[in-house]
């Protein structure tokens, strides 16, 4: 429902309504109003005549709070009208949180997700990180970030995801219009959440709910997301007293960069077990270990 990286836009209301009314599956939506975004771009081009790009800090005003809220509100209303199951991805604003209910995930037909970028960064970080934190939806104000953090524990946010988008650094050149949106985020997603717990944002017990249990429940993923007899052994061991700094050579994404560079973390992933097999241990990625396709209980 919002134009982002890739050709996946569906924004005609009649088409959307048909999808909402007929799909037996959980619908997952990226919600930004393309018409509002395009109007904002036109306004900036009029203001800065002759310029084909703008400083990256304007990205959050182009992909604005209004653009996010208008699209999310439309999706929620369609879900209510049709009875569809809806999951809104990467909610980025305090205002959007007004659309969701505080109750157990098992009782919800409309759920919401936050991503690491919006929980860790804000518009104040553009000055130091520039296009490295350019993503869609854009990072918002510190007040929006605070509201998202609070929603991790008050029942409004059900899932935390990575929105992992490992673009090359060369693709991140430019400003608000030219630089590609997205950032690599898988490697530092869990330690970021553990740091938020350390800061008192959420209890540590809430992290597996948001990052493992609830995704498995929502998408009916077979034998994943829980430590149970008969389930696949997908486990992570962490060191709570590592006290380390992110440096080049300490990250594993093939794109070769991270917005977390030079950040200090107290926690560190020490071992990753996938399908019962150690895939990573104390800085060493084990060659030849491969994942398995997910299966869904429909």
Map each language-model feature to its residues.
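Histidine/acidic residue-rich metal-binding segments in metalloenzymes
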Residues: 2, 6-160
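Anionic group-transfer/hydrolysis microenvironments
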Residues: 32, 92, 115, 165, ...
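Glycine/Thr-rich phosphate-binding loops of Rossmann-like dinucleotide-binding domains
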Residues: 37, 97, 120, 168-170, ...
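His/Asp/Glu-enriched, well-ordered alpha-helical/loop segment
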Residues: 52-83, 132, 153-154, 158-160, ...
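C-terminal/domain-terminus segments
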Residues: 96-102, 288-298
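Short, glycine- and charge-enriched coil/turn segments that flank and shape catalytic ligand pockets
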Residues: 105-107, 126-129, 174, 200-201, ...
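Glycine-rich, flexible loop/turn motifs
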Residues: 115, 131, 135, 179-182, ...
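C-terminal cap of metal-dependent C-N hydrolases
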Residues: 175, 229-295
